[in-house]
Curated annotation (Swiss-Prot):
Location of the Helicase C-terminal domain: 711-876
Enzyme Commission number, as recorded: 3.6.4.-
Enzyme class: hydrolase
Annotated protein name in UniProt: Putative SWI/SNF-related matrix-associated actin-dependent regulator of chromatin subfamily A member 3-like 1
Claim: Transmembrane helix is one of the keywords in the record: no
Length: 881
């Protein structure tokens, strides 16, 4: 990486308004209930559950009976692993623990007396439990069967767990007992390894090896009746693989036929019924390799004939794109303006297809909808595919209406809203295929949007993402749940078969995951030179703050250090959550422009008590002001961008739906600070500011350019001197900063476009189209929100990228860069990261590197601290304490 020269700014600066909220989920550490993954209120428990799995050790097992067998149809065999799932909303026993077999069929419940002892420790993430039936089920008792429940806990909690089990009247058989070695516990006891460092790509190593053994993937040509564009060779091979996965009748991984039965080799489950084939998988090609066109080609086969192998193809056809049917004039109907002639699909064209099914549901973030529309217009013959936009207040509620279309486009947010709707047509519909675009969006299995997509009905399921792993292997669990790949779709099986062995350095975990991903996934990267992309360079531009900026920054950082150190010393960092997020936020904003942090937002509270907005209206006002300038924050419950924002009296911010579900508990507590919470403690945040895309930034202007703005202008003018027609993208996390940049850049003679999260989908699509229009010449600069532009859109018209402020998750920045460096890019791409010297931004870069190292060592044994989130130690580093 090359380092550019320093820039110095004018010394005369003034201050104006307001910051955005950030950093909302980074301190979530309170223990929450480990509830049913898809049928219970959402809690921020995934991270704690994952940590417990990775760091826990087998301390022994207890013998318990599985009861209620006559009420359930699930079959169970001897020496078979079973899934244990907490069921806190059970109307008969809130300590209930369900027992599931490998095929997700319920067998029964753990007997009440044992569940009463174990459930509280499961809910508090003190223990993780796994079950195994020790011997062949006897016919002498139809109502119960013994089960060994293996108890895992962190070393420091083992004494407490043992005493709790003993006080509950249970007998814990530990490793020191003679009977331990003679029991079935040895089947599941994990042998500790050395915690070898393994890169994320090792998961996909077996995928590459399989491809090499088979030779090149079998290529397929798309139906020319639908697809008018020529596919690259790797896209044709990808299409062939997709078709094979959908038509394959092979046994799923880890299943084999033996003595007339079907055996799962991991769990020892036997059945005389052949397991259903997996029709779908994970399409994990690198960002920018043309996955969307490949998927459209797959959909085209629903309309026209059998897949053909690779043959010389005709020239692309001319024509305009499909019409997109957005929504009906009134709720309940969506009229199509196209009359369509269809060819009937033979039943043998698609194995196992219900001939009444023809519709593919595509779920994506709002910013990606425009990319699908553009790809449809560019690559498909007009009038062939009928597309319905299921988004907005006037979307249809008629299932029969949706069945008329080939493609239904919707967003994760739309589906999350409909989770509780009994009459949701999307939930009623039996889809031919569901495609989750940017599928890493559901990496938190507890999130509302994750639960709802996993419940949808479809014959084929595809998880599509260029970043299948962002934090660690646990990100893949939610994909297994969506794909309904049993037994890995059951969390307890995933933990015992994959997660714990990986975390403890056991080679079995990695080999199982490699076999799994080799079977159901395809991943090709840009480094494999599948397409001739021009080179990309990354540079860092360090900016010196002006004397006035330096004086203010040093003063505020000094005050902030004292506040944070005091909170740490008093153990009250979590109780003053909003203070900490405000401190980090304001220091980062000062690095961009002092006007982002006006005088009224430059004071820090030093209280060590729980913050209460009812007694401090100024605190509520500051939180509201912070929200109004921002979009790059997540609800700490669902780990997703919040909808219908609620501020609690303890100064925490959540989605309305998430926090209202928390209030349904008998003794509701704030998920972050554990303070008591009632409905009267909730405050509605005001709606986001209206889209000001028609303004020129006058309302947000600063009287004098900041150091960073001056540096950016110098870089842009130098680029313009090299090539007057260069198009550039400037990314920032602060919407207010984008507005501030408009006036000086326009004054310098640049044509300005803006793309941020406050815009409607229609407006975003319009801006992206205008930026990519070759007729728009001259020096053009797109001011883009980092998060709103980070996925799914095509900005290949640009060749210069400026990251105006850094973000500690490097994957977010890489996703943004891949909007420019992807298929269709003809020019060399230069990306410049702008960093304020001697500031928190330099420490953010260090944190980025830490997270990159973690991504490259995702399967090493976990340390006691949480390495995937910004924790207390990270705060110490960011504040340079």
């Amino acid at each position: 990486m090359r380092v550019l020269k320093y820039f110095r700014a004018p010394s005369s600066l003034r201050h104006r308004s307001s910051p955005m909220a950030q950093f909302l989920r980074r301190f979530s550490s309170s223990p929450m209930a480990n509830e049913d993954e898809f049928q219970s209120p959402v809690e921020p428990s995934q991270q704690q559950s994952q940590d417990c799995v990775s760091e826990s050790y087998l301390i022994g097992f207890v013998i318990a009976n599985i009861v209620g067998l006559k009420y359930y149809s699930g079959r169970i065999n001897g020496r078979e692993m079973v899934g244990l799932v907490r069921e806190p909303l059970n109307v008969y026993d809130n300590n209930a623990i369900r027992v599931l077999n490998t095929r997700s069929e319920q067998v029964g419940h753990i007997e009440r007396t044992v569940a009463a002892v174990l459930a509280p420790m499961i809910d508090s993430h003190t223990i993780v439990v796994e079950g195994i039936v020790p011997n062949t089920r006897s016919n002498s008792n139809r109502y119960r069967i013994p089960c060994q429940i293996h108890v895992f806990a962190k070393l420091e909690a083992s004494s407490t767990v043992k005493s709790t089990i003993s006080r509950g009247g249970l007998v814990l058989i530990s490793e020191s007992d003679t009977s331990f070695g003679l029991s079935e516990a040895v089947v599941v006891k994990e042998q500790m390894g050395n915690g070898d460092k393994r890169s994320v790509d090792k998961i996909f190593k077996l995928v590459d090896e399989n491809v090499k053994l088979m030779g090149k993937l079998v290529a397929a040509e798309p139906p020319r009746e639908v697809i008018k564009s020529e596919l690259f060779a790797h896209q044709k091979e990808g299409l062939g693989w997709l078709l094979h996965r959908e038509k394959s009748g092979e046994l799923p991984p880890f299943w084999e036929e033996k003595d007339g039965e079907f055996l799962n080799t991991l769990t020892n489950y036997r059945s005389d019924k052949r397991p259903d084939p997996l029709r779908g998988g994970v399409f994990a090609d690198d960002m920018g390799l043309g996955k969307t066109l490949t998927l459209l080609s797959l959909i085209a086969f629903d309309r026209y004939g059998n897949a053909s192998t690779s043959t010389p193809t005709e020239e692309p056809l001319d024509g305009e794109g499909d019409k997109i049917e957005k929504k009906g004039k009134k709720r309940g109907r969506g009229k199509s303006s196209e009359s369509v002639t269809r060819k009937k699909l033979k039943t043998d064209d698609v194995v196992g297809m219900n001939v009444s099914q023809k519709t593919t549901l595509i779920v994506c973030p709002p910013s990606v909808i425009s990319a699908w529309i553009t790809q449809l217009e560019e690559h498909t013959v007009p009038g062939i595919l009928k597309v319905y936009m299921y988004h907005g207040g006037e979307r249809t509620d008629d299932v029969n209406e949706l069945m008329k279309y080939d493609i239904v486009l919707t967003t994760y947010g739309t589906l999350a809203v409909e989770e509780s709707w009994e009459d949701s047509p999307v939930k009623k519909m039996e889809w031919l295929r569901i495609i989750l675009d940017e599928a890493h969006t559901i990496k938190n299995a507890n999130a509302q949007q994750s639960r709802v997509v996993c419940k949808l009905k479809a014959s084929r399921r595809w998880a599509v993402t260029g970043t299948p792993i962002q934090n660690g292997s646990f990100d893949l669990y939610s994909l297994m749940a969506f794909l309904r790949f049993e037994p890995f779709s059951i969390k307890s099986y995933w933990q015992s078969l994959i997660q714990r062995p990986l975390g403890q350095g056991n080679k079995k975990g990695l080999s199982r995951l490699q076999v799994l991903m080799a079977t159901i996934s395809l991943r090709r990267t840009k480094e494999k030179s599948l397409i001739g992309l021009p080179p990309k360079t990354v540079e860092t531009c360090y900016v010196e703050l002006s004397p006035e900026e330096r004086q203010l920054y040093d003063h505020m950082e000094g005050e902030a250090k004292g506040v944070v150190q005091n909170l740490i010393n008093n153990g009250s960092l979590m109780r003053n959550y909003s203070t900490v997020l405000s401190i980090i936020l304001r220091l980062r904003q000062l690095c961009d422009d002092m006007s982002l942090c006006p005088p009224e937002l430059r004071s820090f509270t030093t209280s060590t008590s729980v913050e209460d907005v009812t007694d401090k209206p100024e605190l509520l006002q500051k939180l509201v002001a912070a929200l109004q300038d921002g979009e790059d924050f997540d609800c700490p419950i669902c780990i997703s961008p919040p909808t219908n924002i609620i501020i609690t009296r303890c100064a925490h911010i959540f989605c309305r739906a998430c926090i209202l579900q928390t209030l349904q508990r008998s003794k509701p507590l704030c998920p972050l600070c554990r303070g008591s919470l009632t409905q009267s403690d909730l405050y509605n945040a005001p709606p986001p500011p209206p889209d000001s895309s028609n303004t020129d930034g006058e309302d947000a202007k600063s009287s004098t350019k900041s150091s960073k703005v001056s540096a950016l202008l110098s870089l842009l003018m130098a680029s313009r001197q090299e090539n007057p027609n260069t198009k550039s993208v400037v990314f920032s996390q602060f919407r207010k900063m984008l507005l501030l940049l408009e006036t000086p850049l326009k004054a310098a003679g640049f044509t300005i476009l803006r793309l941020d999260g406050a815009m409607t989908v229609k407006k975003r699509t319009q801006v992206i189209g205008e930026f990519g229009n070759p007729e728009l010449t001259g020096p053009v600069v797109l001011l883009a929100s980092l998060k709103a532009s980070g996925t799914g859109i095509n900005l290949t018209a640009a060749s210069r990228v400026y990251l105006f402020d850094p973000w500690w998750n490097p994957a977010v920045e890489e996703q943004a860069m891949d909007r420019i460096h992807r298929i269709g890019q003809k020019q060399e791409v230069k990306m410049i990261r702008m960093i304020a010297r001697n500031s928190i931004e330099e420490r953010v870069l260090e944190l980025q590197q830490k997270k990159k190292n973690l991504a490259n060592e995702a399967f090493k044994r976990r340390q006691k601290k949480d390495e995937r989130e910004v924790n207390v130690e990270d705060v110490v580093a960011l504040m340079s304490l």
